[in-house]
Amino acid sequence: MQVILLERVAKLGQMGEVVKVKDGFARNFLLPQGKALRASDANIQAFEARKAELASRNDETRAEAEKIAEKLDGQTFVIIRSASDAGALYGSVTPRDAADVAIAEGFAVERRQVVLTAPIKELGLHEVRVHLHPEVDVTIKLNVARSAEEAELQASGKSIQELAAEEEAAAEFEIAELFDDIGSAGRDEDEAAN
């Protein structure tokens, strides 16, 4: 089906372009969302008449998105989740979680605007793209931790898994020293008895 794009659509084209798309994509997504019109002669003439209005509306929404982008770009948000000792999350962090934490901090972000390239299933710092407008994307960081203290450690550049490994090695060293002390005390008692 031939359609006229009423706004920029990713991987499809710019506003005003006549493109050929599959019928289902046009009927189920582009037409109901108001992103396109069927490319008939009447619609092409109607679009030409409304082109300036659509362009100014697009410029306004892009300007609003750029204002939000200036404040939002590079922000770090903390998400507290339960996780195993190895750092694997019980569940995963979803776009909804990212949007909710951004909204709690006072940013206007919708769930559908958050783009995760892969599911977040581990503790740590993760970069996430936020698609504010067809022409405006920003990157935010999600600091996924078990507690606020862990989040601060991760933010300072320390890995929770490395810290846990160091603590475990220190504990094993203390246990080995304790057994050495017990073993030498037992030998001293045996020598004193002889």
UniProtKB/Swiss-Prot annotation:
It comes from the Bacteria. PANTHER family: 50S RIBOSOMAL PROTEIN L9. GO terms for biological process: translation. One of its GO terms (cellular component) is ribonucleoprotein complex. Belongs to the bacterial ribosomal protein bL9 family. NCBIfam families: L9 (TIGR00158). This is Large ribosomal subunit protein bL9. Keywords: Ribonucleoprotein, Ribosomal protein, RNA-binding, rRNA-binding. GO terms for molecular function: rRNA binding; structural constituent of ribosome. HAMAP family: Ribosomal_bL9 (MF_00503).
